[in-house]
């Protein structure tokens, strides 16, 4: 059992106390200690040991309850205003969908939610189920090779060769936006991301059979920051900037995507089997990093360990409002409930829906007269076995009528589930290689990175009180000092990763000042933010650039609606500066 299990930790503490206190008691009162067999060395009496274990378990649970910082108060408020803080972050990975170029005849769109199965793992040989988090378009196209080279004037150059299917002409391939995944270790992937998105100076295309090359007006756009790129569902009342931070600290691979734009303007000979894209860089490419086709992949997409889950119908009890939910098939004990999506009852062929309490559409909310009479709320509690139990709390006038007048009534549930830590129980060797749905062409699946461990909301260090203090404040106090900014960002790091700690510790100084100017007859107000970073806390300049891009996007979302933001990073010890353009809010953050 993992020592991160609080119940086990309290149990062990109570057992240690009983044994240590028992020795002292035996020395002070040997006649009475003899009755409990405490005065003799060696093996303890098994009946006394059972008594101690039972007492230690009960007292451990009691101490855990005394130390839990009143979750009944804080969790209710947090779940209403910031529900993302009480949700598990399931296991994540990146998969590659490789179509058979001999069979695919046109561009094929794979919708979000495409299911992938792992190879059987665990004692019960369970196949973990993952689903894609965004749409992906499969093209009759392959990235045949990736290499580095030099221009005649010495500038670094990256060469990408794209090859088409022999049966599909270039005119039928959609080249307008090609997502590419940078499949490498963090230092190389970050350097490649920076080179393509920030250090690109010129782009050329060289078509097979032609001696010269054509200039191209294209670019690589950073991917992973848009609303459609979210890894897990976002509640209607949740602020998207918080999820951005959680995704950055939990699964940075998500931001290792770039979108190649501008290839659709090319005129390519129909019979040409391939063309080379040459990217000339403004800064020299690091000599320590070699490149191959394995480092840039087409048709990659993030996947998450979430799937539709069946649950037993819920029988109402006249004396009960809280119900422990159990999946229909527990398998080997690693199946957990991620969310309750729908609760319904039936009355004389009429469907009665329970609405989420956080939607404010129940009779205690704003639409008092028109609102439904039934609502539900969920709460996550850690069980004694270390897993997380989901409790369903029902309420409303209609619910009171159902349970008192019709106690035999059953509710139907629609759940979303996850396999918890099972994908990482097999020594991190879980392989995702099976597509559930059939396609009209051959499709090979493989995961490009190991599935991550799930991350659970922190339950210590007065976590809920800290986020209430942070989220109740506005934008500018967060920029008062480096310590405040570090503490704010640390609330979103649930992994305990040493690399994340080093990045946060690298924030040396934070300053800001308000600026205003007239532009086209309007008074513009903004805040100029300057953050000094210790470059030694990052895995190269590319890592710094991605961290800055994340902060730039977060500040733009979090700032007051009447303020624009502009971020500048100053790197120590070199003194180099990275400055982003102004971000003008177009809508109220949310």
Describe each model-derived feature in a short phrase.
Residues 31, 347-590:
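C-terminal domain/tail detector
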Residues 58-66, 84, 145-155, 161-174, ...:
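Extracellular ectodomain segments of secreted/surface proteins
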Residues 1-32, 36, 228-268, 274-276, ...:
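Mixed-charge (acidic/basic) macromolecular-recognition segments
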